[in-house]
Amino acid sequence: MTFHVSTQAGVVRQTERHLHSDPPRREELAALADEVRAIIADAVPADVRASVVAAVGVAGTATSCAAIDQELDPYDPARVHGYRLEAGALELMLARLAEMDLERRRHVTGLHPDRAPTIVAGVVILLEALRAFGLDEVEVSEHDILWGAALTVAADTAG
């Protein structure tokens, strides 16, 4: 890894900023997608975006999407870790979830009910990140970003 950046594109912030209707309106989803694209374009130089060859998704949105895509009930971390989420599957998932009101999303197989309020924004963010980097899929990890940082430090120390 030669570049990293933190942005203000989290699911809670973006849900609060853009998704005020239940279910969210098309215009709200478009505004959210526009903002995420702008955040990434401003934060990540074009040459860096063009050089990315793979993505690993960590935390709630990625793991929730992997569980939804596999219709996991109960949740199984062994089946989530290493799962490859394709952009096409995420597009279908977004279309499905965005049509549901919050109460229906709370009952989606694979989705923890507490994630229902933010999952639509999360899928939009994940899709826009894939598009920004020209990727067709993301590999899901059950480990968090600190795990990845520790592995990087260990590799740098060993080599």
Q: Predicted regions: what is each one?
A:
Residues 2-159:
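Helical "lid/coupling" subdomains associated with nucleotide-phosphate turnover
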